[in-house]
Amino acid sequence: MEFPTKYVYITSNLDKPKEWFTQSEMSLTTTTDTIQKSFVNNSGSSSSSKGFGEAVLLDILDTAGQEEYSAMRDQYVRTGDCFMIVFSIDSRSSFEEVSQLKQHIERVKDRDDVPIIIVGNKVDLESRRQVSRIEADQLARSLRVPYIETSAKTRSNIEEAFFTLVRHTPRNTVYKVVVMGGGGVGKSAIIIQFIQNHFVEEYDPTIEDSYRKQVTISGLPPIGGSLNKKSSSSSSSSSSSSGKTGLFNKIFSGKDKQPSPQQAASPSTIDRTGQISTNRLEANVLSYSMSNLSKEVPLITGDCVYCQGCNVILSRFSNLVKTGDDSFTWKCEFCKYSNSNILLEQGEIPNKDSVEYVLSSPSTSSTTDGSKREESIIIYCIDVSGSMGITTEVPSLQSEWVNAKKGVKGASSGPSYISRLECVQSSIPTMIDRLSIQYPNKRVVLVTFSDEVMIYTQSNSVDGPIVIAGDKLEDFDQLIEIGRSMTYDKLPTASGSSDFLKAKIKSLEPVQSTALGPALLVSAAIASQKMLSEVVICTDGVPNVGLGAIEDLPLGPAQEFYEKVTKLAQNNKTTINIIGISGSHIDLGVIGKVSEQTNGNITIIHPLELAREIRKLTQNPMIATDVEMSICLHPTLEINKYDSKQGLSRVVKQFPNVNSLTDLTLLYSSRNRPTEFVQIYPFQIQIKYTKLDGVRCLRVVSAQLQATPDFNTSTSNANISILAMAFTQQAAKIAQQQEYMESRLHLKAATKLIRSLCNTDEQWEEFYNFEVLREEMEAPLITCIKNKQQRVEKAATDDEIQVFYKMKNVHKSFVEGGRKKDISRRKGEAEINKQYYNIKFT
């Protein structure tokens, strides 16, 4: 359990202080307006500043992999300010890519003066050197860019590489740095060493990430100055294209116009100009990461002791009064009920904030965590309707890179196209190869759907697939029966059916309609045979055949059908993931709830990103099932109405399964008329869950915070990442209630509060991360507000729904400063990395 500060802000004011915004700030004609035209310049308050240099923020993209398409990389390359091209001194092939990469960058940017530095990495492997220092220097001089040699392992020249690049870049307060290079050259290692002073031998090359770090660099010209006449001109062009007049400068410009955090936060100095208001936000936020369930905590013998008055559990903060040899009285810190004659031995008294009780042992047939994951089932449920034959233009960035690799110079030969189904056909075989290495015994099933549903397994390779058509598509019970007839022992393993499945996928062709509902039900029935199984649906259209059909039909029957499918999946701990194709419509407002309520992922992506998205699903496995979480606050506090019914101090949340990226937050406040004054506020979270080995446990997490009526005290030294995550999730919850204007106001107020609290480098980094998320929500919210005003039938389309879903489930890695990021998830395995590097993308 985490809190942004050490305090609970208590106020008895019936009228909460307001934040005011002008009509201009709330304009629906732009998505780049922020709360104030001028933001604080943090260069004077950098915690890393030692009296020299300028504080700047580096926004660094780690371009995972090689040529695989990524919308994130596309955006960064187009809007990047400067580029680091990395090769490995023990790999001549990676060195030979340097010139191609530089040409590629210049063609995309349409400039020949892009700030670039060449980095020769792995100088700790001098004995294996294939590229001499002289040869690399000569190439750098011929390309008119600086060259530096580094070792991510020993941290040699790591900072200097980034600082040199920034010094060669037109002056700004935020720099988008793009790190590029061939596979295995150490791009990730360089970035992590720079951010966290840490080295990991093997990184998973498929995980793309961005990092923010505020640093102090000497030798920078003043803002508005230029390196030379030519770069000054290019700087103007770059700033315009990257949106610097929007988000970035607005965060960090206006040096002397912003009051101190204490002044900004004080109720007496709140700006009351404006026509639109919302309640001022507070730092009364609670957060809990489900990743903690995979961490060991002290095991308490015996049964837990419940308060007879409110069902809170005895904790280390409870005041036990000894009344006999092993007898105690406990006056509950929550409800003040006096619990008497409590019999406890010393080992039964909790002595840590987090403790655990075993509720039941696993059955003798239970297996280990790893084997349960490996023995589970994954069903790829693929849309092969006619619309999957629609072609999409390959983004010019991707085409440019392919041409660069081929050594093609000059103008592109013209746009190239790829169908949605072809993207699927190139994505899933790669994933099957990966599963064959990671989980060779995992069962893999291919289900396709058009106007009929087909089930492919190796056992039916002779007779052909099982075909479901006609009236069967309307029969719920028969569809379940067909799915469960595919018994577990008949299902092929990833390693044993790799060639068969890849051949079938390659032979798929688009035909006719979209029987998504029946295909989903059959897939869920197959998956129900093993806990921790998952279904991956890839579709581009609204269901229009069989059960669950939506197109041109009443929604009631379809909603009822998908609710039944959801219950089936929940009962069997199955996760359902939905991947939609951008530019299509699948009605996530109805279908998406199946994924949301089974803790799956909902994603709308470019067809070329299918491989990346499908792979990501296996990189975040479940860690617990049957989770019931009770959050208990003191009776004088109440939970925000979007997290519980109005006015409650306790809320219970249930999850069929959770993973390590499930981070929960809630907002709370003091009641308008508190019944008592409390100096120390207790908090407790009770989590009943089942481990992957079958053990049923109860984890009790307790905490205490000091009360304060002073707003400034309550926000001092705030953990910005917790506030950012909580406010982002809250805005998404509000938007999902179709209160789009209130959601936008909430984000505006959050920006105002968080910005006023920033002092340290880490706080500024995390504020920047929050602003990136806020900007991502801004356009969808404006679209929904306009649609609602115009009385459009569906104010939120699939694109907006997907953004709100993503933001509701945003986790710490999105908002934490670079130094706090958990890089353990970046560790890779040599065999898997080799398999990925051998893939050739087109």
UniProtKB/Swiss-Prot annotation:
GO molecular function: GDP binding; GTP binding; GTPase activity; zinc ion binding
PANTHER family in UniProt: RAS, DI-RAS, AND RHEB FAMILY MEMBERS OF SMALL GTPASE SUPERFAMILY
Domain remarks in the Swiss-Prot or TrEMBL record: In contrast to other GTP-binding proteins, it is characterized by a circular permutation of the GTPase motifs described by a G4-G3-G1 pattern.
Binding site for GTP: 62-66, 121-124, 181-188
Protein name: Circularly permutated Ras protein 1
Domain VWFA: residue ranges: 377-627
Key words of the record: GTP-binding, Nucleotide-binding
Xref: NCBIfam families: small_GTP (TIGR00231)
Biased composition (Polar residues): 259-274
GO (cellular component) term, any one: plasma membrane
Nucleotide-binding found in the keyword field: yes
Region (Disordered): 253-274
Gene name linked to the record: cpras1
Pfam families attached to this UniProt entry: Ras
SUPFAM superfamilies per record: P-loop containing nucleoside triphosphate hydrolases, vWA-like, Zn-finger domain of Sec23/24
